[in-house]
């Protein structure tokens, strides 16, 4: 466990010196909040629900960790990488809501050196955007499909959306 100042220097690590804990606390120093999971009732994806803190199992700022068994390598999601200016303008495709359609090829979020689009952003309000990313190198369920989540520009946090709402777990969220 640890504690990191959000948007400021300084962090504490208490007992667990794993790379995942260090990466998570450094994320707070970079200004990031937790990567959460949107739990909506009645088998809906985006209906009224609640944000489950740390609920994104695929993100370092959630409950994701560096795990060689699952292939997770301690990455932040596409919204966080974009917010930190780790992606160039050409690596994120902004799709204006209802004004633009098209077919876009997503490249692996964890391989930015490949060029191409690594995240799709769909602004839906001044307070929230849809984000889509693909992480096949991570393996497991992430190799099977894209992940969709909300990014909140004013709060620097995110909510993973469950595209398999008939279950209560976030681990089957990829398309």
Predicted regions and their residues:
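Zymogen propeptides/activation segments of proteases
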Residues: 111-175
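Extracellular hydrolytic enzyme modules, especially secreted metalloproteases
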Residues: 1-139
């Amino acid at each position: 466990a640890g504690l990191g100042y959000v948007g400021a220097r300084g962090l504490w690590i208490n007992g667990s010196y794993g790379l995942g804990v260090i990466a998570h606390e450094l994320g707070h120093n970079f200004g990031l909040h937790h990567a959460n999971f949107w739990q909506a009732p009645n088998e809906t994806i985006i209906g009224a629900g609640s944000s489950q803190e740390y609920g994104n199992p695929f993100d370092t700022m959630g409950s994701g960790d560096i795990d060689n068994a699952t292939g997770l390598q301690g990455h932040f999601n596409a919204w966080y990488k974009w917010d930190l200016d780790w992606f160039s303008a050409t690596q994120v495709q902004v799709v204006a809501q209802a004004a633009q359609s098209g077919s876009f090829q997503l490249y692996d979020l964890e391989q930015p050196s490949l060029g191409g689009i690594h995240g799709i952003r769909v602004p839906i309000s001044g307070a929230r955007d849809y984000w889509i990313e693909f992480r096949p190198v991570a393996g497991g369920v992430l190799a099977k499909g894209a992940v969709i989540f909300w990014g909140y520009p004013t709060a620097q946090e995110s909510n993973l959306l469950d595209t398999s709402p008939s279950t209560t777990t976030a681990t089957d969220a990829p398309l």
